[in-house]
Amino acid sequence: MFMKGLVDNVRPGPSGMDVITMHAVARIMLNNWIPSIQASWVKEGSRMSQLLLTAGVNDLGGTLINEGISTAAGAQHGQLMRPSVFRQMIREAGRIPAERYTTYKTRRVFNDTDQELDPLDLVGDDVEGVFGSYNRLVKLDTYRFEHPINSSAKV
């Protein structure tokens, strides 16, 4: 609504303090009833996500490739964060990095000296060339819905 100017007096989004407050209050109010509170690095960026690790957040989500939902909504923070960058960011916040399964069970805890590279760490600078681009994908007519009445395809 903000980006397209559809509604008057709509803010471009929450302030940084709004974001911190929301996560901190969620941690206090939920009182570990929901044990994992995640920061969306795609929406908030790496620096804000790192700060949120000190304000109730204990999960940074994962490495997303060709993510489209946040990108379509205007997120500006990238399509890929390499695992080694995640671990460095977590350590710099004074936390211990761990990898989890989708079910939130811990898969692996990384120690201070772990410098293991993940295959995604080895992807070059041309991330869109390797994985594709959401912005290019949505411009292709190939995947657009065409109502059967207007379609030239034979059914």
Question: What residue spans do the PLM features occupy?
Answer:
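Auxiliary Fe-S-binding modules of radical SAM enzymes
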Residues: 1-155
